[in-house]
Amino acid sequence: MRIAFFLLILSIIVGLAYGYSCPKPCYGNMCCSTSPDHKYYLTDFCGSTSACGPKPSCSGKLYFTADSQRFGCGKHLNLCRGKKCVKAKVYDAGPAEWVEKDAGKMIIDASPTICHELTGGSSCGWSDKFEITATVTSLTDSRPLGPFNVTEEEMDQLFIDHEIAMAQCEAEKTCNGFDLE
């Protein structure tokens, strides 16, 4: 009995130490799950090939993200840190599940421009632990890609719009790895 109790406690400690585990792995090395609390760490990337067509240029002020396996290619996301937000377009897949496991949290991989807009820094790595909120935009959202600020009420509306947009893409099987089933 004591050994079983000890093993239970040990497994809880190990689980807490490693924290994050992807609820829905996909494509062999990525996570298709979205964060239930909409919280992610922000990382930046540039110069890779794109899972969604032509790769975006790394020069200029471009607002793009990876995470197509979660949200779908071409979807628009609102990425917010506090009341500062950026509307971006999903252009690529990623990051790898092992990166999120090492970070201990789901990650939104975004353009260097988004990193700068939301943090003021020149780069964002998972170890920086820049926490952001990510929501899918409403289909009727006419806001252009780029930075904007929100009030508390507007932030609440972003969450409502996200739930509606995710329900639509799940029904269409264009997000959360539904195309794998």
UniProtKB/Swiss-Prot annotation:
The keyword Hydrolase applies. It comes from the Eukaryota. It catalyses: Hydrolysis of (1->4)-beta-linkages between N-acetylmuramic acid and N-acetyl-D-glucosamine residues in a peptidoglycan and between N-acetyl-D-glucosamine residues in chitodextrins. GO terms for molecular function: lysozyme activity. Keywords: Antibiotic, Antimicrobial, Bacteriolytic enzyme, Cytoplasmic vesicle, Disulfide bond, Glycosidase, Hydrolase, Signal. GO terms for biological process: defense response to Gram-positive bacterium; killing of cells of another organism; peptidoglycan catabolic process. GO terms for cellular component: cytoplasmic vesicle; cytoplasmic vesicle lumen; vesicle lumen. Its EC number is 3.2.1.17. Residues 1-19 form the signal peptide. Residues 139-181 form a propeptide. Contains six disulfide bonds. It is found in: Cytoplasmic vesicle lumen. Has antibacterial activity. Belongs to the dictyostelium lysozyme family. This is Lysozyme C. It comes from Dictyostelium discoideum (Social amoeba). The lineage of its organism: Eukaryota, Amoebozoa, Evosea, Eumycetozoa, Dictyostelia. The gene is alyC.
